[in-house]
């Protein structure tokens, strides 16, 4: 379910075994700035609030209502690091279409904005290939393509050694193969 509230403690109240939710998007981590202390705080809050109710955690970096994490964090290196974190945490990760390509929000020219909430940029179509229609056909989509769609598309990144798509696939394969990544606990270690 979607529980659009700003605190994990409030999300946790909607979990249960009767008429309540068994799984809900947990939005507070989505709003974490690119700071280790902020991420740690949100992860700890999520674990504490949901573990207290024997509830299953979920993790979200981007969605159709918020700027893509690559856009928010400002670089592919940060988007890759966030993907590693997302897919290493116990719980259910949600990948928004295009995260595995490192897509940024599309730039919407004045006059083409349709969503009154300004969410069009994160809703741009996913580019499948480098051709002009990016795998969607000859017609122009109602939203413009994300930046660098000629390179950041499934066909190109599938073949590019070390691409963020290849990283995402390796991380997902490791997660499927490792119960520890899906179900295990972790502890924080001090960093220099």
Predicted regions and their residues:
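Catalytic-adjacent loop/helix segments of enzymes that bind and process anionic phosphate/sulfate esters
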Residues: 30
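Loop/helix patches that line or flank the sugar-binding groove of alpha-linked glycan CAZymes
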Residues: 3-6, 10, 14-26, 34, ...
